Curated annotation (Swiss-Prot):
GO cellular component, one term: cytosolic small ribosomal subunit
Function: Required for the assembly and/or stability of the 40S ribosomal subunit. Required for the processing of the 20S rRNA-precursor to mature 18S rRNA in a late step of the maturation of 40S ribosomal subunits.
Compartments reported by the entry: Cytoplasm
Key words, A-Z: Cytoplasm, Ribonucleoprotein, Ribosomal protein
Major place of residence: cytoplasm
PROSITE patterns reported in the protein's UniProt record: RIBOSOMAL_S2_1 (PS00962), RIBOSOMAL_S2_2 (PS00963)
Pfam families, per the entry: Ribosomal_S2
CDD domains: RPS2 (cd01425)
Protein name in UniProt: Small ribosomal subunit protein uS2
InterPro entries xrefs: Ribosomal_uS2, Ribosomal_uS2_CS, Ribosomal_uS2_euk, Ribosomal_uS2_euk/arc, Ribosomal_uS2_flav_dom_sf
SUBUNIT field: Component of the small ribosomal subunit. Mature ribosomes consist of a small (40S) and a large (60S) subunit. The 40S subunit contains about 33 different proteins and 1 molecule of RNA (18S). The 60S subunit contains about 49 different proteins and 3 molecules of RNA (25S, 5.8S and 5S). Interacts with RPS21.
Gene name linked to the record: RPS0
Length: 287
């Protein structure tokens, strides 16, 4: 599946193809849009369309070359209303200097200059043409080129460059955005050569459930607390307060061998006490 329309320097490595397959970027939907037919490899017996990952890699390189052609990185706007792509576009923007719109796209952001969120990008990249339809529609009004991650059933109206991939899986979306960011940095010279691996793991671009993140944070705090209490207790309680275990114990304040201050004659001591056999004194008044 190696792309034949690219210079040899842009050819995908076996690791890149394996990563695309492992992320299930080649698994499309059962529906097929007519403009996505050239990117189809085959249709399985269960009706699922399989995407040609060689075509996917070609479009990743093409999209990266278009993004690199923009002089100011901030003039590129990456958009994702789909939750699985929000973390990916934020990381892409952080690594490449682009603007990110993660979540709901405010209508009028490209056409209404009165709004606070008004932007004038020279290029937009969207995660899903269906969920990001408002952004694509406004971009068509102001002549902004559009790059989109398109599944086999995605509408391609007003899309200039379609990257054929699975745009519904969390791993597939993160993998494509990670590869696109890496290719942009390679073309800009941030990554010196193609043999040098990028030190950013692809896992950073994957969607994570907020509840799972909160649980992981609680577990980390518990483990950190256990690790801090153990050495701290040993150092402060035993090491500093314990002293020398073999040292002789200090003498008591008063000698235990001295005779206690007790009466010598118990009979004389009891003489002043009233006899238990005597009758009780009469009460002063009657109830």
């Amino acid at each position: 599946m190696a792309p034949a329309n690219l210079p040899s320097v842009f050819n995908a490595t076996s690791q890149d193809i394996e990563m695309l397959l492992a992320a299930q970027s080649h698994i499309g939907s059962k529906n097929l849009q007519v403009h996505m037919a050239p990117y189809l490899w085959k249709t399985r017996q269960d009706g699922v369309n399989v995407i040609n990952v060689g075509k996917t890699w070609e479009k990743i390189v093409l999209a990266a070359r278009i993004i690199t052609a923009i002089d100011n990185p901030a003039d590129v706007c990456v958009i994702s209303a789909r939750p699985y792509g929000q973390r990916a576009v934020l990381k892409f923007a952080a690594h490449t200097g682009a603007q990110a719109i993660a979540g709901r796209f405010t209508p009028g952001s490209f056409t209404n200059y009165i709004t606070r969120s008004f932007k004038e990008p020279r290029l937009i990249v969207v995660t899903d043409p269906r969920t990001d339809a408002q952004a694509i529609k406004e971009a068509s009004y102001v002549n902004i080129p559009v790059i989109a991650l398109c599944d086999t059933d995605s509408p391609t109206e007003y899309v200039d460059v379609a990257i054929p991939t699975n745009n519904k899986g969390r791993h597939a979306i993160g993998c494509i955005w990670w590869m696109l960011a890496r290719e942009v940095l390679r073309l800009r010279g941030t990554i010196y050569n193609r043999e040098t691996p990028w030190d950013v793991m692809v896992d950073l671009y994957f969607y994570r459930d907020p509840e799972a993140e909160a649980e992981d944070k609680v577990e980390e705090e518990k483990l950190a607390g256990v690790e801090e209490v153990g050495p701290a207790a040993i150092e402060s309680g035993f090491a500093t307060g314990g002293g020398d275990w073999e040292a002789t114990a200090p003498a008591a304040a008063s000698g235990w061998d001295d005779a206690a201050a007790q009466p010598q004659n118990w009979d004389s001591a009891a003489q002043g006490a009233a006899s238990w056999d005597e009758a009780a004194a009469p009460k002063e008044g009657q109830w």
